[in-house]
Amino acid sequence: MKDGMYHFIVGVFGFFLWRGKLIGEENLPRHGPAVFISNHLDAAGPIAAICSIPVRVHPWVIADMMDKDLAPIWLQADFVERQLHFKPPVSRWVSRALCSISVPLFYSLGCIPVYAAQYQRMHATLETSMGVLQEGKYILVFPEDYRLPKDPVTKMQPFQHSFARLGERYYTETGESLEFYPLAIHGTRRLVVGKPIVFNPLNPVGLERRRLKQLMEDTIIGMYMHLEVGNASTALSVERK
């Protein structure tokens, strides 16, 4: 899909499904490559992030959601029944109908399938991502671990650190440090962009993965909580170590 068509589709989605407020636009990267890291906030998160960021992004998507046979199972349990409150067999029919649209749309938008539970196949995710980054483009990652319980206040699940491997691979292949931009999406139709956190190649691999993961998680939680208490301006000044 060409960029013009991408922005047209995103604009339509934004008009009907989001129409929210972007805070911290001055923190957006002036050029790529870069990686955006965001909380998920159920179905609203991906829509909010894609519609708010004024550049084309390539989101990481669970591989099963891009498989025409497996996607209805995921969608039925995670969205149609849990969020739309449909019951079987109607939920099954609705899921299949939605997937006939969503799966082709994911591919058209340039989404990258993520094989998080399959270590060997995760290499394919990284290879595709490297191709995107080396073209100076942008990737969007929602690193919450869906297998773990949500925090009752932030509605977030603990982050996984697989996204940090992008920094490792990019530095190995280019000798440059990749920037990761935190995004905090709130249910009041507000999205905050924070200042970038830069991959540090001087740290041991394991330490840097943990550092990026924890720093990004803490930063996004901090920005979210400032939005929660209604102070959008301080959401941009969350201190990072």
Language model features: what each stretch is:
Residues N27, A49-C51, V103-L105, M130-Q134, ...:
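Short, charge-rich binding segments
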Residues R30-A116:
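Catalytic core of membrane glycerolipid acyltransferases/transacylases, capturing the structured
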Residues Q118-K241:
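Non-catalytic C-terminal accessory region of glycerolipid acyltransferases
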Residues R19-K21, H58, G110, E179:
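Conserved beta-strand segments of alpha/beta enzyme cores
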Residues F8, R19-E25, G45-P46, C99, ...:
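A generic local structural motif
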Residues M5, I9-F13, S102-L105, S129, ...:
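Hydrophobic alpha-helical segments of integral membrane proteins
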Residues D3, V10-D42, C51:
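Helix-to-loop junction immediately C-terminal to a conserved catalytic motif
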Residues E26-L28, A63-M65, A117, H186, ...:
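Short, solvent-exposed coil/turn elements at secondary-structure transition points
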